[in-house]
């Protein structure tokens, strides 16, 4: 089995693949818990950014894919983002596109977060 590549930096632009609710060992996080999955996605975005020499401060845009989106999910989205922000010590407010989708790559996934970042190169 191969290890997934979570992102790449080309010149000073990093485009991260969609981060999902999996821990560092690939185990599911937050089964059925939307806020917990959002939190894990944001934590994974931060980890992937560090892997390409960046940080959450470098994020230029986020795209969030939510299964069966409805406005009633907004408080849970905010809860998950807030918990991740507190753990990471970051300002999570970034330009964002939120898209409702029918399904994601695996049946337990409720949310996926992609990021584009501009990273200063030494």
Question: Residue spans of the language-model regions?
Answer:
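Short, polar/acidic, helix-capping and beta-turn segments at strand->helix junctions
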Residues: 1-122
């Amino acid at each position: 089995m191969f290890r997934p590549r979570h992102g790449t930096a080309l010149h000073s632009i990093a485009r991260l693949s969609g981060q999902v609710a999996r821990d560092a060992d690939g185990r599911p996080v937050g089964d059925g818990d939307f806020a917990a999955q959002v939190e894990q996605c944001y934590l994974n975005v931060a980890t992937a950014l560090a892997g390409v020499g960046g940080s959450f401060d470098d994020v230029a845009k986020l795209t969030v894919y939510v299964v069966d989106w409805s406005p009633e999910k907004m408080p849970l989205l905010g809860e998950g983002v807030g918990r991740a922000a507190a753990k990471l010590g970051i300002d999570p407010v970034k330009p964002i596109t939120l898209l409702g989708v029918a399904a994601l790559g695996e049946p337990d996934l409720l949310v996926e977060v992609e990021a584009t970042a501009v990273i200063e190169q030494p």
